[in-house]
C-alpha cells in the first residue's frame, strides 16, 4: 500500500540483483562479485571461530554445516574458500567481508601465504569419489579422466597435494553433501565408509587438509530408513565430523532482508519505525535465551 493511489509497491522498492540468484560453489568461487552484498552475521562468525578453534587445538579437520534451505550456507562456503584462495585480491576482499582481522585463531588454523587449493564439489545422487576426483583434477588444472579411481588413491592424492609446497593446504567443500548420502543410502552411490576414511586421513594431515560438508538435515536423517546395524555404522561415520548448526537468528534474518530490499523513496517516519521494530526483535531474542 502506498500514499498515492495508482502507485504500486514495486514503484518504491525492489530486490537487489545479487540477492536474486542462488550461489553455486563450483561456479562462483573465484569471482569477486560473488561476495557482493554478503553479510557475515554472528552465526557465520561463530561457525568460523569454532572451526578455527577445533583445527588449532585438536586434530579435528572435518566439519558439517547443517541448516535449512536458503540459510546462507553456500554463500559462507564461497566466502570462506575465497579467504584461502591463491588469488591475493580475492583473498583480501573475502577477509574484509568476513572481518577476519578480529579473529586471530583463523590465521593460526589456516595459515595463508601462497593460498590453499580449494576443491569445490556440488553433490548429486551419484558417486562422491567420482565427483571429488573430477573436482580435484579441475582444481589442479588437469583434464578430465573417465577412468575409475579407488577411494584410497583419491585420498592419497588429496593428502599428497596438501603437503605440496605449491599450496598452504587443501580445502574440500562438499556442497549438497546430503545428495551423496542419499545415494549411499539407496545404494546408488559409494559406501558411506569413504567419508570416514577421508576424515581419518585429514586428521593425520597436520592441518593441511580440511573438509567442509554442507547439509540440510542431520547426517543420521539421511540414513533413517536403513536397518539398525547400518544406522550404527552411519553414526560412527558421523562421529568423525563435527556438526555446526547453521540457523540464523531472527534479527540476522531481518538485517539480511533489510539489505536485500532497495528503496528509492523512504517516508520520513521510516527510520524511527524500523529502529523500533529491530529493538523489539532483539529484546524478544534476549528473553528467549534467558
Per-region residue spans from a language model:
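Walker A/P-loop-proximal flanking segment of P-loop NTPase domains
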Residues: 1-71, 78, 83, 229-244, ...
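Conserved P-loop NTPase mechanochemical-coupling segment
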Residues: 27-34, 113-153, 174-186
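Intein modules and their embedded homing endonuclease domains
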Residues: 56-64, 74, 82-89, 116-118, ...
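Hydrophobic or amphipathic alpha-helical targeting/insertion segments
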Residues: 67-98, 205, 212
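Flexible phosphate/Mg2+-sensing switch loops adjacent to catalytic phosphate-binding sites
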Residues: 81-116, 143-153, 223
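Conserved P-loop NTPase catalytic core
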Residues: 108-127, 200-290
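Conserved P-loop NTPase "ATPase switch" module shared by AAA+ and STAND
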Residues: 162-191, 214
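Substrate-gripping "pore-loop 1 plus following alpha2 helix"
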Residues: 186-198, 225-230
Amino acid at each position: 500500500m502506498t500514499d498515492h493511489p495508482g502507485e504500486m509497491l514495486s514503484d518504491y522498492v525492489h530486490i537487489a540483483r545479487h540477492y536474486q540468484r542462488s550461489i553455486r560453489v563450483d561456479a562462483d568461487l573465484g569471482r569477486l562479485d560473488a561476495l557482493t552484498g554478503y553479510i557475515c552475521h554472528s552465526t557465520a562468525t561463530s561457525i568460523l571461530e569454532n572451526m578455527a578453534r577445533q583445527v588449532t587445538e585438536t586434530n579435528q579437520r572435518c566439519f558439517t554445516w547443517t541448516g535449512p534451505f536458503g540459510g546462507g550456507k553456500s554463500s559462507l562456503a564461497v566466502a570462506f574458500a575465497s579467504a584461502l584462495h591463491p588469488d591475493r585480491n580475492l583473498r583480501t576482499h573475502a577477509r574484509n567481508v568476513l572481518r577476519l582481522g578480529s579473529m586471530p585463531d583463523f590465521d593460526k588454523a589456516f595459515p595463508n601465504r601462497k593460498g590453499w587449493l580449494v576443491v569445490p564439489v556440488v553433490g548429486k545422487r551419484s558417486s562422491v569419489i567420482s565427483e571429488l576426483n573430477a573436482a580435484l583434477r579441475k582444481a589442479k588444472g588437469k583434464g578430465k579422466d573417465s577412468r575409475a579411481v579407488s577411494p584410497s588413491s583419491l585420498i592419497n592424492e588429496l593428502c599428497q597435494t596438501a603437503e605440496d609446497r605449491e599450496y598452504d593446504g587443501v580445502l574440500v567443500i562438499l556442497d549438497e553433501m546430503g545428495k551423496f548420502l542419499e545415494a549411499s543410502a539407496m545404494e546408488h552411490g559409494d559406501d558411506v565408509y569413504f567419508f570416514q576414511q577421508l576424515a581419518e586421513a585429514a586428521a593425520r594431515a597436520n592441518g593441511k587438509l580440511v573438509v567442509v560438508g554442507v547439509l540440510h538435515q542431520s547426517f543420521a536423517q539421511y540414513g533413517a530408513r536403513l536397518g539398525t546395524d547400518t544406522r550404527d555404522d552411519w553414526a560412527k561415520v558421523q562421529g568423525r565430523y563435527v556438526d555446526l548448526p547453521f540457523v540464523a537468528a531472527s534479527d540476522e534474518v531481518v538485517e539480511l532482508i533489510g539489505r536485500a530490499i532497495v528503496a528509492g523513496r523512504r517516508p520520513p517516519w521510516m527510520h524511527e519505525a524500523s529502529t523500533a521494530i529491530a529493538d523489539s526483535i532483539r529484546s524478544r531474542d534476549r528473553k528467549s535465551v534467558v
